[in-house]
Design a protein with these regions (language model features):
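A conserved acidic beta->alpha catalytic loop
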Residues: 43-53, 70
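Short, acidic, metal-binding catalytic loop of nucleotide-sugar glycosyltransferases
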Residues: 26-36
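Glycine-rich, basic loop-to-helix element that forms the pyrophosphate-binding segment
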Residues: 68-84
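A recurrent flexible, glycine/aromatic-enriched loop bordering the glycosyltransferase active site
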Residues: 74, 146-164
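The conserved acidic donor/metal-binding loop of glycosyltransferases
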Residues: 93-97
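Terminal low-complexity segments of carbohydrate-biosynthetic enzymes
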Residues: 222-293
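Conserved donor NDP-sugar-binding/catalytic core segment of glycosyltransferases
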Residues: 101-137
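Short aromatic/hydrophobic "clamp" motif used to bind/position activated sugar donors
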Residues: 89
């Protein structure tokens, strides 16, 4: 295969990550690759000054630091993508450790058109024997990790913690959902949207990165935001029956109240646009991946 000059923009959304940002970048810069890349850090109103070290000259010329005012992880990633210079976008959490040539191996799957989006296997930093290979959903729309399969394979859900996507594919589906103001379901929504628009999402089990699974978030995550995102996702992509089932999953808050908020925010306009432009419907998606919902 003739090597083309594909370059990668690596985008890290950051909020109150403490020493993780520095550790992650140290791992990245020490890891072998033949691929040229840029690093974009979107510091979304961190309160712990975790990105201040990037002002030092040693890091300054290696990293493009963007500061945002608490826009949430979805929009922070989109802002990073808009600033990206290269044709491939690699979204990463700011608490990862890498293996040699991980970027090269992921990029090969896209360059050879084996898939449109790819994630590596993701191991726990605390116990690297625990590894997940892409994700699917259970009957209450909760995440379940796949076991290992030989070779590249399709996955219903791409974990947001580490994945590579062509820039034009990302923007063709409108990026991460701009109506998600807080953390929750942003990778699930993007994955479903990609499949419905006819793009393939895959896991490359030959690449493993380590991810710090945290006991709790370093910033406030509340039920309201998570439920809002869940129901908004349903309104964007699901049929009426599944929208109703999604409302039934809202137990710690008033479903009616959350539904009113979702509808007030103009979700139906975007839904109509998606229904016009997609290649498959939610019925196909849930059947195809054998998700009983």
């Amino acid at each position: 295969v003739q090597m083309d000059k594909s370059k990668v923009s690596i985008i890290f959304p950051v909020k109150n990550e403490g020493a993780n940002v520095k550790n992650t970048l140290t791992s990245l810069f020490a890891t072998d690759t033949t691929i040229e890349y840029e690093v974009i850090i979107v510091d979304d109103a961190s309160e712990d000054r975790c990105c201040d070290f990037l002002e030092q000259s040693h890091f300054k010329n290696k990293v493009n630091l963007i500061r945002t005012e608490g826009v949430g992880p979805s929009v922070a990633r989109n802002i990073g993508a808009e600033k990206a210079k290269f044709d491939y976008l690699l979204f990463c959490d700011a608490h990862l450790a890498f293996q040699p040539f991980w970027i090269d191996k992921l990029l090969t799957t896209l360059r050879l058109d084996m898939t449109d989006v790819v994630c590596p296997a993701i191991a726990s930093m605390d116990d690297p024997k625990i590894v997940g290979y892409g994700q699917t959903l259970n009957s209450s729309l909760r995440i379940q990790w796949h076991k290992k399969k030989p070779g590249l394979f399709h996955t219903a859900i791409i974990p947001g913690g580490c994945f590579l996507i062509k820039r034009d594919v990302f923007f063709n589906v409108g990026g991460f959902e701009t109506g998600f103001k807080t953390w929750g379901h942003e990778d699930v929504e993007l994955s479903i949207k990609l499949w419905l628009f006819g793009y393939r999402c895959s896991c490359e089990p030959a690449v493993t990165i380590k991810h710090l699974f945290r006991k709790s978030h370093p910033y406030k995550v509340d039920y309201d935001g998570v439920y809002y995102n869940l129901l908004r996702m349903a309104y964007l992509h699901f049929n009426q029956d599944r929208i109703k089932k999604t409302k039934d999953l809202i137990i710690h808050r008033s479903p009616k109240k959350i539904e009113n908020l979702v509808l007030k925010d103009g979700v139906e306009q975007r839904r109509r646009k998606y229904l016009q432009n997609r290649s498959f419907n939610d019925e196909w998606y849930f059947k195809h991946f054998n998700i009983h919902f």
